[in-house]
Amino acid sequence: MTWQNDYSRDYEVKNHMECQNRSDKYIWSPHDAYFYKGLSELIVDIDRLIYLSLEKIRKDFVFINLNTDSLTEFINRDNEWLSAVKGKQVVLIAARKSEALANYWYYNSNIRGVVYAGLSRDIRKELAYVINGRFLRKDIKKDKITDREMEIIRMTAQGMLPKSIARIENCSVKTVYTHRRNAEAKLYSKIYKLVP
């Protein structure tokens, strides 16, 4: 089975964030050749572990690569990309620094599951587990970002300073820094490094 063929339709989302549905694959970001190749090989490799046909997976699923290169777009436009994939079975592939964000989107939207791409885990089994629909809230392995932390992350990603954020959120600057520190602990990184 090959996952490469012609394009059948494209979805455009503001500022170059696009989701491309090819007749035989559905990934986001479509320009991430390494993600595409690796995911294709993994899915073919786990064919015997999954209950659904490969054709159904190609037709009904969206696999989203949440890595540090794409986080700014996903954070700034989460309502847009969530709307663009409505009706699809969304699987988030989360790098270590994006696990808490993946958990936030799992809890706050219609995400099928999260595959934690940490080095110590068997990604094949985790991917099959999610595709087979067995991923549940009890499977969340890390903290999730709170709604307030997410608002502060979004505003920081847009270049807003803590004082401006405090004014908008109707809280003190100290509170903004506290939420930011809590989010950074969950993300294993400073926010400004994740969303330059």
Curated annotation (Swiss-Prot):
Domain HTH luxR-type: 138-196
PROSITE patterns from the UniProt entry: HTH_LUXR_2 (PS50043)
Top-level taxon of origin: Bacteria
GO CC annotation: cytoplasm
Family under the similarity heading: Belongs to the EcpR/MatA family.
Record's note on what induces expression: Negatively regulated by H-NS. Positively autoregulated. Also positively regulated by IHF.
Annotated organism of origin: Escherichia coli O17:K52:H18 (strain UMN026 / ExPEC)
Coiled coil feature spans: none
Keyword annotations: Activator, Cytoplasm, DNA-binding, Transcription, Transcription regulation
Reported function: Part of the ecpRABCDE operon, which encodes the E.coli common pilus (ECP). ECP is found in both commensal and pathogenic strains and plays a dual role in early-stage biofilm development and host cell recognition. Positively regulates the expression of the ecp operon.
Location(s), subcellular: Cytoplasm
DNA-binding region, residues: 162-181
GO molecular function list: DNA binding
One GO process term, biological-process aspect: regulation of DNA-templated transcription
Identification of the protein by name: HTH-type transcriptional regulator EcpR
InterPro entries linked: Sig_transdc_resp-reg_C-effctor, Tscrpt_reg_LuxR_C, WH-like_DNA-bd_sf
Primary location group: cytoplasm
